[in-house]
Amino acid sequence: MSDSSQIRIMIVEDHFVVREGLKAIINSQKDMLTVAEAGNGRQAVEAFEQHQPDVTLMDVRIPGLNGIDAIGSIVAKFPNAHVIVLSTYGGDENIFRAFQAGAMAYFLKDIKGQDLVDAIRAVHAGQRVVPPEIAAQLAGRVPLTALSPREMEILTLVAKGKSNKEIGAKLAISEGTVRVHASNLLSKLHCSGRAQAVSEAIRRGIIEVE
């Protein structure tokens, strides 16, 4: 099969071993070829512009510009981009935001090799692919009242174990203001306490904690 008839694929993944594994699966297919790789979101956007692959495999949690924002940047410039998300994380907000950004498929990284290459072919043909476990997450999604940037900052700091005093000092606001924002975000997440809010936010992919 000639190169012109192969599906040209870009892999965006910050873990070398995972990237090499994906490349081996792809390059074992006669109708597929890896044409570009990237280890972070900014590299992904630049590599897409340079190579304009037929299908992109995109991790969500990558350094710098995250995968979802990278998808948004790519699709904004190339509306016909075909992106498949491969992620360790299946939180409903992650999934929702990925599709909202322009992804055509979302899979967890435990996907079998044959299922992956089948999905690549389907997405290349213009089909959206939503496996049952991902569809179930979307179906059960509770719409999130958007957290403000300040609430997101506070939630992330709470997740890191910071006290109201420490949060206030870091953000240059009073402890009282921290408490008000914390109360608001608890209400939006439908949680009764901070520990529950952090657990829920991580589970749903609203925040990331290193």
Where are these regions (language model features)?
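Conserved acidic carboxylate
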Residues: 13
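Acidic, metal-coordinating helix/loop segments flanking the phosphotransfer/catalytic sites
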Residues: 37-55
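Acidic catalytic/metal-coordinating carboxylates
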Residues: 40-43, 63-69
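Short amphipathic alpha-helix used as the core "switch/output" element in two-component signaling
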Residues: 46, 68-80
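Active-site residues of response regulator receiver
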Residues: 59, 87
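Short, conserved "switch-loop" micro-motifs in signal-transduction and mechanochemical regulators
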Residues: 89-90, 176
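Short, flexible helix-to-coil linker/hinge segments that flank and couple to helix-turn-helix
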Residues: 93-100, 104-153, 206
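Recognition helix of helix-turn-helix DNA-binding domains
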Residues: 163-196
